[in-house]
């Protein structure tokens, strides 16, 4: 059996979209599941779109996602170089071989020439059958040229796709595509065929947008007498629009790149776990997987033909599940940079607050909004003191707050246990239920009905002076 070798071949043009991450992930997982190799290859043939530092960004993204190439730039391997701009001479050699075999030709048309809006609809093949003496004269005169693939004018080209089955295209619809540009650089459609063959790629896993190009690739394999690899074209990742419809995932749907999601506070492992299930179904009902577990069970048979819809709420769920597996210490250390503007007292007691937040946030990016009241206390409406469940009204709150404040003023050791003991003693002697007492205290301390932790935690984290000042403010608002 042929050794499984897959590749991820991005263009260095910017951030890594979720769809590209999924392509890399599936290639990696399929290789690992079959004890094969996963290659990283940089397709930088379009120098006009090249973004500085993009290659490092791609490598860093893969590293953060725990996708480790076996071969590629910076990873070693016997099939290098793994950057297409460094393989220029290789492509020219094979293009000239096609010319000699009659499967390609030099096109001397200038920019805009040789194209027609009717008939064929693309390049009209002006140079396809130029006499050799005309070609020689143009070459001698130094006229610039591109090299085009000579497509068959009749018949059909069929290829098998593991996801979509047999796909057939009429050859008459195929334009004589450019293989080598005037600057000597190959086009994507040519370079990737040469590289996939020379690097012994067994399975090409890529987006469905390349289905229309694949017949041209298959013909190139036939022209060279090479066995084509297996093709796996993945359906797109979609986003849900406001009207309920779906369209290809883009920035209007929210964050769409791996780096953006990480900046929002999603864990890389949660992102890759969720992205793996966007179009692939494992045989069990299990959803949370480690990379190692997915690398053991991933199969192409589990891939769907239908587009997957990116669901941010589902990603929140995955991230929450991963938070649960973290130790309180690890969560505290990782979450502190997302805390925003916090007081020194909160910072000093961050492990305590972080432990409360761990089960209350779906991602780190939600933390600042849940705790901003500690450092930035905003005014609130006294209507918040109403709570039917706990039988609290603003009038009732006006009775409770002064009494509770008096009790707290007598707490000399402002520790969690001392505060807790004092409040419980007050509740017991008052004859009121705990919720009845705690509700007005929570509102006066936080200015909001929902907080991480209970009233005792709020009192401790605010500190005695600030806590009593906020309760006094509540008393005055209710007067």
Please give the residue ranges for each predicted region.
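N-terminal Rossmann-like or analogous alpha/beta NTP/dinucleotide-binding catalytic cores
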Residues: 1-118, 213-226, 270
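Residue-level signal for inorganic ion chemistry
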Residues: 27, 58, 98, 102, ...
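Glycine-rich phosphate/pyrophosphate-binding loops
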Residues: 32-44, 190-203, 224-238, 451-457, ...
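Conserved phosphate-binding loops in nucleotide/dinucleotide-binding enzymes
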Residues: 81-85, 180-181, 199-210, 238-274, ...
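Active-site cores that bind ATP or allylic diphosphates and position pyrophosphate for catalysis
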Residues: 97, 105-249, 257, 282
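Residue-level detector of well-ordered alpha-helical segments, enriched
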Residues: 270, 314, 331, 349-356, ...
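Small-residue-rich helix-loop
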Residues: 328-430
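Charged substrate- and nucleic-acid-binding regions of tRNA-handling and nucleotidyl-transfer enzymes
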Residues: 416-478
């Amino acid at each position: 059996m042929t050794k499984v070798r897959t590749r991820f071949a991005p263009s260095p043009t910017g951030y890594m979209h979720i769809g590209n991450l999924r392509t890399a992930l599936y290639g990696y997982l399929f290789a690992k599941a079959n004890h094969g190799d996963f290659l990283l290859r940089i397709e930088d043939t379009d120098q006009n779109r090249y973004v500085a530092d993009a290659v490092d960004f791609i490598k860093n993204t893969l590293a953060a996602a725990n996708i480790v190439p076996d071969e590629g730039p910076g990873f070693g391997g016997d099939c290098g170089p793994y950057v297409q701009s460094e393989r220029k001479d290789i492509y020219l050699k094979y293009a000239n071989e096609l010319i000699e075999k009659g499967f390609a030709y030099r096109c001397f048309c200038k920019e805009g020439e040789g194209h027609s809006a009717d008939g064929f609809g693309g390049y009209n093949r002006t140079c396809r059958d130029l006499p050799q003496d005309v070609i020689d004269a143009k070459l001698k005169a130094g006229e610039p040229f591109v090299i085009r693939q000579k497509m068959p004018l009749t018949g059909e080209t069929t290829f098998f796709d593991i996801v979509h089955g047999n796909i057939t295209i009429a050859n008459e619809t195929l334009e004589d595509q450019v293989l080598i540009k005037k600057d000597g650089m190959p086009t994507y459609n040519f370079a990737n065929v040469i590289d996939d063959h020379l690097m012994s790629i067994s399975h090409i896993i890529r987006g469905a947008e390349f289905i229309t190009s694949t017949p041209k690739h298959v013909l190139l394999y036939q022209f060279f007498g090479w066995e084509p690899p297996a093709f796996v074209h993945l359906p797109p990742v979609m986003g849900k629009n406001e009207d309920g419809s779906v369209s290809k995932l883009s920035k209007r749907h929210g964050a769409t790149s791996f780096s953006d999601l990480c900046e929002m506070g999603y864990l890389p492992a949660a992102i890759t776990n969720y992205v793996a299930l966007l179009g692939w179904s494992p045989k069990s009902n299990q959803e949370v997987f480690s990379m190692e577990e997915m690398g053991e069970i991933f199969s192409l048979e589990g891939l769907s033909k239908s587009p997957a819809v990116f669901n941010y709420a589902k990603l929140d769920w995955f991230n929450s599940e991963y938070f649960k597996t973290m130790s309180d210490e690890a969560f505290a250390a990782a979450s502190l940079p997302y805390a925003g503007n916090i007081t020194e007292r909160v910072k000093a007691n961050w492990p305590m607050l972080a432990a409360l937040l761990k089960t209350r946030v779906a991602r780190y990016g939600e933390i600042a909004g849940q705790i901003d009241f500690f450092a930035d206390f905003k005014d609130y409406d006294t209507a918040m003191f109403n709570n039917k469940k706990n039988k609290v009204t603003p009038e009732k709150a006006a009775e409770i707050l002064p009494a509770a404040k008096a009790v707290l003023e007598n707490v000399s050791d402002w520790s969690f246990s001392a505060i807790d003991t004092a409040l419980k003693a007050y509740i017991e002697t008052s004859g009121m239920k705990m919720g009845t007492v705690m509700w007005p205290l929570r509102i006066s301390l936080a200015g909001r009905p929902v907080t991480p932790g209970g009233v005792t935690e709020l009192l401790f984290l605010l500190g005695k002076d600030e806590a009593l000042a906020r309760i006094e403010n509540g008393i005055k608002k209710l007067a």
